[in-house]
């Protein structure tokens, strides 16, 4: 997904 809860996703994330 695109949330800050996903460590594999680094960059613009939805807090």
Swiss-Prot record:
<keyword id="KW-0872">Ion channel impairing toxin</keyword>
<keyword id="KW-1015">Disulfide bond</keyword>
<keyword id="KW-0800">Toxin</keyword>
<feature type="site" description="Reactive bond for trypsin">
    <location>
        <begin position="14"/>
        <end position="15"/>
    </location>
</feature>
<keyword id="KW-0722">Serine protease inhibitor</keyword>
<keyword id="KW-0166">Nematocyst</keyword>
<comment type="similarity">
    <text>Belongs to the venom Kunitz-type family. Sea anemone type 2 potassium channel toxin subfamily.</text>
</comment>
<comment type="function">
    <text>This recombinant serine protease inhibitor inhibits both trypsin (Ki=2.5 nM) and chymotrypsin (Ki=30 nM). It may also inhibit the TRPV1 receptor, a receptor of the pain pathway. In vivo, shows anti-histamine activity, since it dose-dependently weakens the clinical manifestation of the allergic reaction induced by histamine injection. In vivo, does not show toxicity to mice by intraperitoneal injection.</text>
</comment>
<keyword id="KW-0964">Secreted</keyword>
<dbReference type="GO" id="GO:0042151">
    <property type="term" value="C:nematocyst"/>
</dbReference>
<dbReference type="GO" id="GO:0090729">
    <property type="term" value="F:toxin activity"/>
</dbReference>
<dbReference type="GO" id="GO:0005576">
    <property type="term" value="C:extracellular region"/>
</dbReference>
<dbReference type="GO" id="GO:0004867">
    <property type="term" value="F:serine-type endopeptidase inhibitor activity"/>
</dbReference>
<protein>
    <recommendedName>
        <fullName>PI-stichotoxin-Hcr2l</fullName>
    </recommendedName>
</protein>
<dbReference type="GO" id="GO:0099106">
    <property type="term" value="F:ion channel regulator activity"/>
</dbReference>
<keyword id="KW-0646">Protease inhibitor</keyword>
